Swiss-Prot record:
Belongs to the bacterial ribosomal protein bL12 family. Keywords: Ribonucleoprotein, Ribosomal protein. GO terms for biological process: translation. This is Large ribosomal subunit protein bL12. The gene is rplL.
Length: 125
C-alpha cells in the first residue's frame, strides 16, 4: 500500500474513527500526538489569518525580566553580546530591552534558551 493510498483512506475516516486510530497508534508506538498537534495548530493559525504574509526570517530577542538570578543573567548577556559589565548590567536593569536583533530563528531560540536557563523572562519578536 502506498503512502498516498493510506492518506486517502485515512481521509475517509469519521472524526471518531480518526480519534480511535490516533489512540491505537499512540499505544502501539508509545508516543503522544498532543504536542505535535498543538504545534501544528499554532503554526497553521497565522497562515489562515494572513495567507499573503511571508514567514519571518529575522528575530529580536527581548529580555523582559531578569528574574531571581540577576547576576547569572548579566553573565549570560555579557557572553552573548560582548558588552562590558556595566553595559550588560544596565541592559538587564532596564528590562524590557533587546539583547540581540536581526538574527535567525535558530539563533534567537538558542539565545532565548540560554537566558531562560538562568531564570530570565524572554520574548522573541
Amino acid at each position: 500500500m502506498s503512502i498516498e493510498t493510506l492518506v486517502e483512506e485515512i481521509g475517509k475516516l469519521t472524526l471518531t474513527e480518526a480519534s480511535e486510530l490516533v489512540k491505537a497508534l499512540e499505544e502501539k508506538f508509545g508516543v503522544s500526538a498532543a504536542p505535535a498537534m498543538m504545534a501544528g495548530v499554532m503554526a497553521a493559525a497565522p497562515a489562515g489569518d494572513a495567507p499573503a504574509q511571508e514567514e519571518k526570517t529575522e528575530f529580536d530577542v527581548v529580555l523582559t525580566a531578569a528574574g531571581e538570578s540577576k547576576i547569572n543573567v548579566i553573565k549570560v548577556v555579557r557572553a552573548l553580546t560582548g558588552l562590558g559589565l556595566k553595559e550588560a548590567k544596565d541592559l538587564v536593569d532596564g528590562a524590557p530591552k533587546t539583547v540581540k536583533e536581526g538574527i535567525s530563528k535558530d539563533e534567537a531560540e538558542k539565545v532565548a534558551k540560554e537566558l531562560k536557563d538562568v531564570g530570565a523572562s524572554v520574548e522573541l519578536k
